[in-house]
């Protein structure tokens, strides 16, 4: 199967929100635009920043009408009324955050791939800006096209992958007039490309304003792939408390770092010169190792390192993935990523693995940055969850980071798929998915993620049972297992095909798990059609069943003495909503101060004369909610009970937080 062998070298609406294009009166004439005379953004409101960059256009983003947990992605409604205009319908990726002058800058790349394009099309960068009040309200200003890849004369003008902007205060933090900004970006080097080499290199641009215009700071690449011997992308710049600057970068399981030169008199870091070996030209590179010193990066590292210091500890946050150094257990497919982190007592490692901050999302990468803004800490990343999004049309998100007393990080990551956190008659998203077989790069979890793409551009966008062409097995099954009980009377299945191995099934059926543990066919099915494609779901209705599991059983078409493979992009299960389900409020729970509450996995739902214990998805509970004694409400959504979108979902539970609370011992007799 062609989907099982390729890898991509890269770094990588419930309610409407307003998006309005404006041209601030502070914009200067194009003929006066230079990096040296760019007006300072200090002292200006985030939505009225002055600039003299003729390429910049501005959009105001207001997500305040959305429930707070649904404000991701930041630009989720930006330009969706003009879907084919990618200057307005903006897809952003590879976020890197900067706190400057009381404002939060989230710099991004710009995805311009068509919906069916299976690679990256990136040529410029933009930035979302807000302040503390704006962040709390979901309000941002988007300054688009602050820089283009062709600003470097030695670059091809594309490959505008993940970059980072840092501010240099010139040793005078109270005086913003002499501040400079440096933009570290990967671009494609013309000379390397002409020589048939991996073209990626890191360039560094500078400007008096984070909105540009920018100029090449050194007139050549800072680092090239021929120098580093790895694809030189994903730069992350960090200045330690002693004034030493470090540039981390790397991908495909290898993370490198290099120290920047320091001024012998001031002790301040250079932003444009790296340390070299004794010959004066060869970069003095450091290979990151995990705590066991047996890999070319921290455990599970794939790419997108972000290094910072908090107290005496250095934190290395990165995309974890299976192609990485070691095994990232947070993902199933080679084409997925989660956000992991490791720690060290040195910015050059070795790195001790700590865990996952944000679980795997809906894009092949996530590309994190972590920083303190005001009194809180935040993590930025991207997903494919904007309307029309794919793995190559991504959108940037931001969530709060919580810290434990011993310096561990967790994120109250708000799901970006509304289907899972809003009342709905589709109960599929509440189920755990299993399969009799899954092709290695495919992902069985894609079938209940709420996304039906026009084109499957990477393997995790669907589930397939591909083994060979043809294959000896006649068919396979997908199974939904719920923690509680659901009452369902319909299913909708999207089958996928390709020009090679994947065909519509010859036949399929829905089965349910009976109370005695036996699989049985649903009764009175309306019919099992076998159409394919996004616009052609196959819907079947049947007599309502009360069950904890459903099976989608498929038989492949007979071909060449064997059977064709089948693929499923999405499988929905419809609750028996016509029976007007009613929820019984759950009993309150108690937890100890500082301990996350254990919320009930199910609540009772009455369907006519039948009562079932239905599963619940609880909305994320911030650590601050149980940090001290008191009480609060947790909100969630019960499977299969429809309703309007709301902050509160359709069920709540009272949580009491007590100092020194200890739960009673479990005296239930094992069954």
Regions found by a protein language model. Name each.
Residues 579-610, 668-671:
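Solvent-exposed, low-complexity, repeat-rich "mucin-like" stalks and linkers
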Residues 649-659:
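C-terminal edge beta-strand
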Residues 353-373:
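Conserved blade-ending motifs and adjacent loop-strand segments that build the rim/top face
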Residues 459-523, 534-578:
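Aromatic, loop-rich ligand-recognition surfaces of beta-strand-rich domains
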Residues 609-649:
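Serine/threonine-rich, repeat-prone extracellular segments and beta-strand-based repeat modules
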């Amino acid at each position: 199967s062609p989907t099982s062998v390729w890898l991509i070298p890269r770094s990588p609406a419930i309610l409407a929100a307003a998006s309005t294009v404006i041209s601030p009166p502070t914009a200067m004439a194009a003929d006066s635009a230079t990096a040296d005379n760019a007006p300072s953004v200090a002292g200006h409101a985030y939505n009225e920043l002055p600039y003299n960059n003729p390429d910049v256009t501005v959009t105001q983003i207001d997500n305040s009408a959305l429930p707070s947990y649904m404000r991701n992605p930041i630009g989720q409604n930006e330009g969706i009324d003009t879907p084919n205009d990618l200057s307005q319908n903006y897809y952003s990726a590879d976020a890197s955050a900067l706190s400057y002058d009381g404002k939060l800058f989230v710099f991004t790349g710009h995805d311009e791939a068509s919906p069916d394009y299976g690679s990256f099309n990136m040529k410029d960068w933009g930035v979302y800006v807000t302040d503390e009040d704006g962040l709390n309200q979901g309000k941002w200003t988007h300054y688009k096209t602050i820089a283009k890849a062709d600003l470097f004369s030695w670059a091809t003008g594309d490959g505008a992958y993940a970059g980072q902007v840092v501010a240099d205060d010139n040793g005078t933090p109270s005086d913003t007039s002499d501040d400079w900004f440096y933009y570290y970006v990967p671009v494609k080097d013309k000379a390397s490309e002409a020589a048939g080499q991996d073209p990626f290199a890191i360039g560094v641009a500078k400007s008096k304003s984070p909105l540009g215009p920018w100029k090449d700071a050194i007139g050549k690449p800072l680092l090239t792939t021929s120098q580093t011997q790895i694809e030189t992308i994903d730069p992350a710049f960090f200045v330690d408390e002693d004034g030493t600057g470090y540039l981390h970068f790397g991908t495909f399981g290898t993370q490198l770092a290099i120290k920047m030169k320091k001024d012998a008199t001031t002790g301040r870091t250079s932003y444009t010169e790296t340390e070299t070996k004794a010959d004066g030209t060869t970069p003095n590179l450091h290979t990151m190792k995990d705590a066991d010193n047996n890999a070319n990066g921290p455990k599970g590292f794939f790419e997108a390192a972000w290094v910072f210091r908090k107290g005496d500890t250095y934190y290395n946050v990165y995309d974890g993935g299976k192609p990485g150094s070691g095994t990232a257990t947070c993902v199933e497919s080679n084409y997925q990523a989660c956000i992991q982190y490791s720690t060290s007592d040195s910015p050059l490692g070795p790195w001790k693995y700590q865990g996952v901050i944000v679980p795997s999302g809906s894009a092949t990468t996530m590309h994190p940055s972590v920083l303190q803004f005001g009194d809180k800490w935040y993590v930025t990343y991207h997903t494919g969850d904007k309307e029309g999004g794919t793995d190559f049309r991504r959108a940037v998100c931001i969530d709060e980071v919580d810290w434990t007393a011993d310096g561990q990080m967790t994120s109250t990551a708000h799901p970006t798929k509304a289907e899972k956190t809003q009342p709905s008659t589709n109960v599929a998203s509440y189920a755990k998915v299993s399969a009799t077989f899954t092709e290695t790069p495919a992902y069985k979890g894609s079938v209940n993620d709420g996304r039906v793409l026009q084109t499957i551009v990477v393997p995790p966008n669907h589930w397939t049972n591909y083994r060979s062409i043809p294959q000896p097995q006649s068919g396979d099954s997908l199974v939904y297992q719920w923690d509680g009980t659901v009452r369902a009377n319909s299913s909708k299945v999207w089958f996928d095909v390709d020009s090679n191995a994947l065909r519509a099934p010859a036949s399929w059926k829905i089965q349910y798990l009976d109370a005695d543990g036996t699989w049985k066919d649903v009764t009175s099915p309306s019919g099992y059609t076998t159409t394919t494609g996004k616009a052609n779901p196959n819907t079947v209705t049947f007599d309502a069943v009360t069950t904890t599991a459903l099976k989608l059983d498929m038989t492949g078409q007979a071909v060449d003495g064997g059977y064709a493979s089948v693929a499923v992009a999405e499988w929905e299960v419809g609750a028996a909503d016509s029976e007007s389900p009613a929820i019984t409020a759950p009993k309150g729970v108690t937890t100890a101060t500082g301990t996350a509450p254990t919320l009930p996995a199910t609540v009772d739902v009455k369907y006519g004369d039948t009562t079932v214990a239905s599963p619940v998805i609880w909305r994320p509970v911030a650590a601050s909610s149980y940090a001290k004694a008191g009480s609060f409400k947790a909100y969630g959504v019960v499977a299969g009970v429809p309703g309007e979108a709301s902050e509160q979902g359709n069920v709540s539970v009272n949580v009491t937080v007590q100092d020194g609370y200890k739960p009673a011992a479990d005296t239930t007799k094992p069954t």
